[in-house]
Amino acid sequence: MVYNTSCLILPLALIILDFTLISSLAHPIPSTLNVLSYGAKPDGSKDSTKAFLAAWDVACASANPTTIIVPKGRFLVGNLVFHGNECKQAPISIRIAGSIVAPEDFRIIASSKHWIWFEDVTDVSIYGGILDAQGTSLWKCKNNGGHNCPTGAKSLVFSGSNNIKISGLTSINSQKFHIVIDNSNNVNIDGVKVSADENSPNTDGIHVESSHSVHITNSRIGTGDDCISIGPGSTNVFIQTIRCGPGHGISIGSLGRAEEEQGVDNVTVSNVDFMGTNNGVRIKTWGKDSNSFARNIVFQHINMKMVKNPIIIDQHYCLHKPCPKQESGVKVSNVRYEDIHGTSNTEVAVLLDCSKEKPCTGIVMDDVNLVSVHRPAQASCDNANGSANDVVPFTPCLKREIIIT
């Protein structure tokens, strides 16, 4: 007897397909993923790195929005890298009720440039929680002149990412920068707290580089370096309602370290309180040839309290001697200072040290009143051009506007 095998194959294939569909429906990816379910321990001593990565892999594979829960407790993790290039691009929220802590031995995470790194992700949000990088021992190593100290790891990094939200997060004791936004678009950072010792080296609070449409709001930052720094290639950055101190202020730069370098365009810094910082609002560029630029910058509605350099443009920036002897090639233009008041901890409250090669142009000051706590405040300026209205101290390089009413 001859059987028609084709008649058997088709029903069998349909049965297998039906079974696969039923299995997938019976075990859908849940919308909420608790890291405890993947082996994480909230005791601060067991390594939970693999558990966090496992939870991410499941969320990444979901075609629907998912939330990763980090409950109360202390979760010890090493270097975490969350890749997004193979995700289905559904929104992922990470809600942290407890603390994520790094190992006490700083060398464990310092072997990498990043402690917690999100790479090529889209629609990722982080809410609440504490990141404790336990960087104090590395700071001591560096401050004591140790030659074998590693550079250190940045605590939280987003690179090549889009539509990112960080809300209510606290970052403490970072080895290096606390929060880094690199080569990313549409980023909102709100209500974060950053804390590190004022002598902690290179611990910028929030650093933005090569990124576009970044909003930083309602945050308190006290650290050993810039509270917020805006690096090359950044555009459309909005900073509002910030308390900065201790720290080195809010900086555009440093720029011009490389000869071929993107510039910074369209930055607004508004409603900021500087408390005992080394600088207030600063633009810093290296004294060397470069095609970089800083333009269309607004600093407004700012209070200074015992700030060493409330307003400063430093186009001869240099960290370590010997310093370059060239003039800076970075072009600084269209910078507006408006409604800035308070006290300077030094005699020179306004320092505009611009490049001879490319003088600053379009510098506008309006309603600026800075007084020195020791003696009458002064302004020092070189190679700066622009206008001033109602400015104390008198800034001779800026023409006084005549207001006709």
Curated annotation (Swiss-Prot):
Q: What is its main location?
A: secreted
List the Pfam families. Answer: Glyco_hydro_28
Assigned keywords, A-Z: Cell wall, Cell wall biogenesis/degradation, Glycosidase, Hydrolase, Repeat, Secreted, Signal
EC supergroup of this enzyme: hydrolase
Matching entries from Gene3D superfamilies are given as:
Single-stranded right-handed beta-helix, Pectin lyase-like
Tissue expression:
Expressed in developing and germinated seeds in the chalazal region immediately adjacent to the site of penetration of the radicle through the testa.
Q: Which SMART domains match?
A: PbH1
Task: Note the superkingdom of the native organism.
Answer: Eukaryota
> Could you tell me the EC number(s) of this protein?
3.2.1.15
Q: Which GO terms describe its cellular component?
A: extracellular region
Question: Which reaction(s) are listed as its catalytic activity?
Answer: (1,4-alpha-D-galacturonosyl)n+m + H2O = (1,4-alpha-D-galacturonosyl)n + (1,4-alpha-D-galacturonosyl)m
First and last residue of the signal peptide: 1-26
Tell me where in or outside the cell this protein is found: Secreted, Cell wall
User: What molecular function does GO assign, one term?
Assistant: polygalacturonase activity
Active-site residues, record numbering mapped to chain: 225, 248
Q: Which GO terms describe its biological process?
A: carbohydrate metabolic process; cell wall organization
Q: Where are the PbH1 repeats?
A: 184-210, 211-232, 264-285
* PANTHER family for the chain: PTHR31375
Sequence similarity? Belongs to the glycosyl hydrolase 28 family.
What this protein is called in its record is Probable polygalacturonase At2g43860
Protein species of origin:
Arabidopsis thaliana
